[in-house]
Regions:
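Catalytic strand-loop segment that frames the active site of acyl-thioester-processing enzymes
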Residues: 20-59
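Hydrophobic beta-strand core residues of beta-sandwich domains
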Residues: 16, 42, 58, 100, ...
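RNA-interacting cores
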Residues: 7-9, 40, 57, 67, ...
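HotDog/MaoC-like acyl-thioester-processing domains
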Residues: 2-5, 35, 105-154
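Hydrophobic beta-strand-centered segment that forms part of the acyl-chain substrate-binding groove
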Residues: 2-4, 73-115, 140-144
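Flexible, low-complexity linker/boundary loops enriched in proline and small hydrophobic residues
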Residues: 2-29, 95, 147
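Compact, glycine-rich, soluble single-domain proteins
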Residues: 53-60, 64-74
Length: 154
């Protein structure tokens, strides 16, 4: 990743409306108006693994979708709207109309790569086709989702 992309990734992540305990984005490795690619490594010690299939822990599907939404929709919108360049703006996202297929489980400590392609962005709604792959490149989840958002002053 280039120094410019590294700095842009940092700026985008800082504008995401999530605290450290609920941010599922480690890095944005590519972004333009139509596409975004990022990654996240699920922590081995995350508390949900103790209760989600305790004898064979897997990452809950709702958290996979959250990761996909944070990278593929919210971070992409921060880029498209150039929110990363603006001061005193807070983004309030609302995920809706999600269609998802879960294809492979994601385990503890696994790094996932999320790639989203914009289908359209109009009237404050971003619709994207989003893929979540494991570090071997295997497709684990495929989703199409909409994101609506409101900007608030901080």
């Amino acid at each position: 990743m280039t120094m410019v992309m590294n700095e842009l990734s940092r700026k985008i992540i800082l504008k995401l409306p999530y605290g450290d305990d609920f941010r599922f984005v480690d890095e944005i490795s590519f972004v333009d108006e139509n596409r975004i690619v990022g990654n996240y490594t699920f922590r081995v010690d995350a508390p949900y693994y103790a209760s989600h299939y305790p004898h064979n822990p897997v990452t809950p599907g709702v958290l996979l979708l959250e990761c996909m939404g944070q990278i593929g929709l919210v971070a992409h919108l921060v880029y498209i709207e150039k929110i990363y360049e603006r001061e005193n703006v807070a983004l309030i996202p609302s995920l809706s109309n999600v269609q998802a297929s879960f294809l492979l489980p994601v385990g503890q400590g696994e790094k996932v790569i999320v790639e989203a392609t914009k289908i359209y962005y109009r009237a404050g709604v971003l619709k994207s086709d989003i893929l979540l792959r494991n570090s071997s490149g295997e497709e684990c989840v495929h989703a199409v989702a909409h994101l609506k958002f409101v900007e608030n002053e901080k």
